[in-house]
Amino acid sequence: MDYKPAMAHSSPNIVICGAGIAGVAAAYALTVDHGVDNVVMVEPGIPLSLTSDKSTEAYRNWWPGPDRAMTAFMDRSIDLIEDIARATDNRINLNRRGYVFATSDAGKIPFLRDMAKMAEARGGGAARFHDTPSSLYTPSPEHGFDFAFTGADVFTDTSLIRRYFPYLSPTTVAVAHARRAGWLSAQQLGAVMLEAVRARGVKIVKGRVVGIDAGTRVRAVEVARDGERLMLAADHVVLAGGPMQSEMARMIGLDLPITAERHFKVSFPDTLGGLPRSAPMLIWLDEQHLPWSEEERAALAEDEEARWLFGTFPAGVHGRPDGASATIILYNHHGDAVDPVFPLPEQEHYAEIALRGMSTMVPALQAYGGKPTRPYIDGGYYMRTRENRPLIGPVPVEGAYISCAYSGFGIMASRAGGELIARHITGTELPDYADAFLLSRYQDAEYRAMLENWGDDGQL
């Protein structure tokens, strides 16, 4: 990809604390989109390696909430990601296979219908309902992203479900296929942006942020590097610390309303072809008891510490095919707030729980007997606010900005999040959704009241 330099102009020193996807996207928007120079990123490790590469790499514009802010924000981010895909001959392997939400509970049919109608009202595209065997439906293509359909298709005719999604559990009674959704290579998206910012002269200082010189405004960032302390002059500081964001924010006297939730994913070679290579992202909406054989149940019953595996597991197990033969599954069945620590503690039985949970939705995966072949587990932390909306923009300390709380949607939101930070810093026109992501929203009494009745926060 050839990066045409934007019109450069004299600009203040900008230090971005963190070179995960949020920090790199901010640097990209500042330098490539706005022509800003004098940008430095500070990162203690390898850029994009702490948690940015530990996701399902998926995206969607299907978001609940009391207004259209998240849908508009994600639509903008997807637009910008598609621009990168077009400019690089789709080096980032972007597809638009969609997200399929499925249930075996007829009581959830009104929920799926309402979600589709709400998404339509929020600007997410038309809701289409398929209640008879003759209803017309156009499947999403396996490859590419220039696909006209948006919105969602809601199926309640089981013969149609069997025709178009034959791999789903025969107990499935309803499906919603959100269409402006799919996945990409997060590694390649990050690499494209990182290459571009380096070409624009952005320097990456390897070190740990240990202090920020700020009274009423920021002046410098203190970095510990190779046993020495380095002071980086700064007129603007962007805190994009991912799991370390709370620690960084306290350096300027901020106590951010964010918590950390641990998440994992398992990838394994699907040698038995349990999940078809053409499948979309699949999400099971029902609570469940994991499927165990009688022999397994008897063995587990004898182990007091393993009896919790007989309990009720939450809705939300989801997975997708990955490349020619692998399958990825996420099942975040423990959502408690924790303090981020690295390396990530191991989660007992995770691969088996995830595979068994997913096999409830896709019975062909039961062929593995709950034992995936050569499973690879990684994970990270979802840094999130109570209502699961990000924090993007200026804070009370002049010259300081935050780009954080991207929860499980950091990859898909990265381009719009970076653009929003760049617009705040450069003083250019802000989009309508900008106020929805400011830290100052929590000072608004009406917003605080809305938090008490927020409803679905959209986290998978």
Description of each model-found segment:
Residues E57-L160, Y164, P314-V317:
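Dinucleotide-binding Rossmann-like beta1-alpha1 core, especially the glycine-rich loop
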Residues A6-A22, V40:
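Beta1/beta-strand and adjacent pyrophosphate-binding region of the FAD-binding site
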Residues F147-R163, A337, E348-R415, E419-I425, ...:
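Flavin (FAD/FMN) cofactor-binding core of flavoprotein oxidoreductases
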Residues T271-E398:
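Active-site lid/adjacent beta-loop-alpha segment flanking the redox-cofactor pocket in flavoenzymes
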Residues G227-A299:
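Central helical "cap/lid" subdomain
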Residues T31-D53:
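Glycine-rich FAD pyrophosphate-binding loop
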Residues A72-D75, A102-I109, A176-E195, P343-E352, ...:
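Short beta-strand to alpha-helix junction loop
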Residues S169-T171, V175-H236, A240-P243:
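Helical element adjacent to the flavin cofactor pocket in flavoenzyme catalytic cores
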